[in-house]
């Protein structure tokens, strides 16, 4: 997390929709980065970003923290919502840290995750992060990974991560490979059981 915020030049606007995982707010404070909170709104029981508000407050070349599926609200953004967001990103040239760690753990069968970076018009604005830890219950094994299409951003991220973020270890790599190659039946059973707890 620190290696991400270290990428952001000082005095650059960082927009963080709230509520959010608390460390996303703590890290920039320790690095003396300025955060602009964007309170999310309740849209028929879904906690979502107010895109009109985002468009009005976002400055050119700002950064956005985006979480999809949203944590703690659980909202899975629709493809239409992702496209609406992408227009703002393109218009303002916003760079986005996209936390998509829960993308494989969606309990409602009628909902589908759309990766923000899958939209070609903005793919080079997106640093997307994934992990097997949430869905496959393997936290602590250093098996998260990033998808960063922009060469300059990817090089800067790797450089900033040196000495801050540990490299992947062999145990984590094996766990990641096993989860994504052989863990889907287990994931499906997990979703079936977890779905019974929805109210």
PLM region spans:
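Active-site phosphate-binding strand-loop segment of PLP-dependent enzymes
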Residues: 36, 41-111
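Conserved coil-to-alpha-helix start sites within the AMP-binding
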Residues: 1, 20-24
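A short helix->loop->beta-strand "cap" motif at the edges of active sites that frequently abuts
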Residues: 12, 33, 91-95, 123-124
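Phosphate-binding glycine-rich loop
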Residues: 1-13
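Structural detector of well-ordered beta-strand residues that form the stable sheet scaffold
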Residues: 15, 36, 97, 127-129
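Short hydrophobic alpha-helical segments of the AMP-binding
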Residues: 28
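PLP-dependent aminotransferase class I/II
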Residues: 125-195
């Amino acid at each position: 997390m620190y290696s991400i915020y270290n990428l952001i030049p000082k005095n650059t606007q960082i927009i963080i929709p709230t509520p959010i995982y608390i460390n996303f707010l703590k890290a920039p404070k320790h690095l003396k980065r300025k955060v602009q909170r964007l309170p999310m709104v309740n849209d028929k029981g879904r906690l979502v970003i107010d895109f009109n508000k985002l468009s009005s407050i976002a400055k050119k070349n700002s950064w956005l923290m985006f979480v999809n599926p949203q944590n703690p609200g659980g909202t899975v953004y629709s493809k239409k919502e992702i496209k609406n967001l992408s227009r703002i990103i393109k218009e303002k040239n916003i760079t986005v840290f996209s936390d998509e760690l829960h993308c494989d753990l969606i309990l409602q069968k009628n909902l589908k995750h759309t990766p923000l970076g899958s939209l070609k018009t903005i793919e080079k604005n997106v640093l997307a992060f994934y992990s097997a830890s949430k869905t496959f219950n393997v936290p602590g094994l250093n098996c998260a990974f990033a998808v960063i299409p922009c060469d300059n951003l990817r090089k800067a991220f790797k450089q900033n991560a040196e000495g801050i973020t540990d490299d992947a270890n062999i145990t984590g790599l094996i766990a990641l490979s096993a989860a994504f190659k052989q863990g889907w039946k287990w994931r499906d059973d997990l979703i079936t059981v977890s779905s019974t707890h929805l109210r």
